[in-house]
Amino acid sequence: MTRYIFVTGGVVSSLGKGIASASLAAILEARGLKVTMLKLDPYINVDPGTMSPFQHGEVFVTHDGAETDLDLGHYERFIRTTMTQNNNFTTGRVYEHVLRKERRGDYLGATIQVIPHITDEIKRRIIKGAGDADVALVEIGGTVGDIESQPFLEAIRQLRFEVGARRAMLMHLTLVPYIATAGETKTKPTQHSVKELRSIGLQPDVLVCRSDHPIDVSSRRKIAQFTNVEERAVIALEDADTIYKIPGILHSQGLDDFVVERFGLQCGGADLSEWDKVVDAKLNPEHEVTIAMVGKYMELLDAYKSLIEAMSHAGITNRTKVNLRYIDSEDIENQGTGLLEGVDAILVPGGFGLRGVEGKITAVQFARENKVPYLGICLGMQVAVIEFARNVLGWKDANSTEFDRTSAHAVVGLITEWEDATGAVETRTESSDLGGTMRLGAQECQLEAGSLVHDCYTKDVIVERHRHRYEVNNNLLPQLIEAGLKISGRSGDGALVEVVEAPDHPWFVACQFHPEFTSTPRDGHPLFSGFVKAALAQHQKNS
């Protein structure tokens, strides 16, 4: 019988509901409970797949191929449960489903309304997403008071009433600001945020109070009195020097004990030793490297959230401080490769569109010719193939049909047919919709024995997640191979190029998949770990 913890946020956005929720989930998992998490997004887009990275940040891809909110990445990094398409849904997805049922006549002529039809669909999806977990944490996006969030808040109010207080509770994150001129933290914004919640029938059971200063006992007592929340359930969550400290901070204040007692759960104590090791390795590195990350969305680093975290995990695995030097690929186009001088390795991540592509190609050339360790991901692999074709094969017009459909040497082109994770055949054309039409989700990849990538994984077959609609053109592959390009990974059916390596280079690996989506702080990821090891070797060589 699943218990539900609904998580809301107030006062301001970006308080870290996802991190706080995932940290609590990690503690409950460490106590032996089966835990899952859901993210409910109030925007009207069906999913974030076509949203600008500058507005939404990263699109996290699940094992089963859903394009989801970046918070699902936090969830998978903190708990062992693999997220699916059922763990994230939007207002747009809910309305799309309800309207489709209305068109079919499923409602038998009833007037379709927010209550009960939309709220019932939200509740149905929450219950389905929770599955058979002992505890499901359900995060509602946005801030209490937003018009967009109202159907979700009403739905959780109803569900909380239907399952009862022993199976549902509400955790509310608020901001307790520090006023420097007064020299104290202020509780009034939290009081008003809870007042807003209570006006719609929701009484929080737990308050997590975010602040950049310590919150004293008297302030916590005052918050408890004015919000009708138990004092021990008013949790102070001050800014930490690493997010992986948060499970320990919440546990030290007894949040998991409160949840377990409230739900009447039978479980053991929390063993957070794995998290202690992560924090120790993160804060006490023995080495240091500088890696250039060349992308086009550098104004909003959340666009690369999982990748940045994966590099941090690789640093933890190697007890190495990884300094990422963020370089806009357009700056390389305008200022040259001097921006890359002195780095220990170069990373080119995925992306879409023509802007900044030539800068990425220049970065690849710099890495290949100067023997600097290189890791290319998704588009980072495609530009590696383009660069090789231009500067080794001599095809100066080599390109991708994404950027130039008239190129005589289109070494990268649209995938028109492939098998998805279930074995079903997918087909696409240039006129297909952008939303939900890419090669998505987990796919098998066969690795070439003796290759750099095989040395990293130490496996013949791996499974990694994809999000792309362009691939290496097999028609021109023989010439690329003859010129020395190494194909060290292919799709399970052998039809698509998945990994390439450059000849006569200490460490040059480019992959079509997104390994960052499966990296975790406790386990790291073999490819990123190998990349950081190569950067360490380069650093020692340059020292």
From Swiss-Prot:
Residues binding L-glutamine, per UniProt: G351, L379, G380, M381, Q382, E402, R469
Annotated binding of ATP, by residue: S14, L15, G16, K17, G18, I19, D71
Binding residues annotated for CTP, in chain numbering: S13, D146, I147, E148, K186, T187, K188, P189, T190, Q191, K222
Binding-site residues for Mg(2+), renumbered to this chain: D71, E139
Active site positions, chain numbering: C378, H514, E516
Entry binding sites for UTP: S13, K186, T187, K188, P189, T190, Q191, K222
Pfam families associated with the record: CTP_synth_N (PF06418), GATase (PF00117)
Known function: Catalyzes the ATP-dependent amination of UTP to CTP with either L-glutamine or ammonia as the source of nitrogen. Regulates intracellular CTP levels through interactions with the four ribonucleotide triphosphates.
Misc remark: CTPSs have evolved a hybrid strategy for distinguishing between UTP and CTP. The overlapping regions of the product feedback inhibitory and substrate sites recognize a common feature in both compounds, the triphosphate moiety. To differentiate isosteric substrate and product pyrimidine rings, an additional pocket far from the expected kinase/ligase catalytic site, specifically recognizes the cytosine and ribose portions of the product inhibitor.
Annotated protein name in UniProt: CTP synthase
